[in-house]
């Protein structure tokens, strides 16, 4: 189901109580991305793992940012913001994943792979549009 590429991430809590601490993985499949994440459990509430599946055509941008003495970030921006509503800290279809140290080499490749798969999806969509226009003539 998955290619060999996955990136582990851990976003620290953004609120004072420490509730929005997230851990998860981004898997790159043949036809889609799968973002699996879980909020840190609270004293009286256990959280389930959330799974968000995104087609490559739905991804607007993927960027890997690596600066010295700062967390390594993999930034995803989607065309459908409602898919990322459950992700704490998501900003109108944009999420920043703080890549764990052991996944930094994969994160660089993931951004390039997403760009490549996006190109394939857009090419396929364009070919379908051309075929439809030829059939209607």
Report the location of each language-model feature.
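Short, solvent-exposed loop/turn segments at secondary-structure junctions
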Residues: 41-44
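Glycine/serine-rich loop-strand microenvironments at binding/catalytic pocket rims
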Residues: 37-39, 60
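Polybasic phosphoinositide-binding surfaces of eukaryotic membrane-targeting domains
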Residues: 22-37
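Acidic, Ser/Thr- and proline-rich intrinsically disordered linker/docking segments
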Residues: 1-23, 46-137
């Amino acid at each position: 189901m998955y290619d060999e590429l996955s990136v582990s991430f851990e976003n620290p809590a953004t609120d004072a109580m420490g509730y929005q601490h997230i851990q998860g993985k981004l898997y790159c499949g043949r036809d889609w991305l799968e973002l699996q994440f879980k909020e840190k459990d609270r004293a009286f509430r256990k959280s389930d793992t959330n799974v968000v599946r995104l087609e490559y055509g739905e991804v607007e941008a993927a960027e890997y940012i690596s600066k010295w003495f700062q967390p390594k970030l993999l930034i995803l921006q989607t065309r459908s913001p409602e898919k990322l509503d459950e992700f704490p800290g998501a900003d109108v279809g944009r999420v920043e994943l703080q890549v764990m140290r052991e996944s930094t080499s994969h994160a660089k490749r993931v951004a390039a792979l997403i760009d490549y798969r996006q190109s394939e999806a857009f090419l396929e969509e364009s070919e379908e549009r051309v075929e439809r226009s030829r059939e209607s003539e």
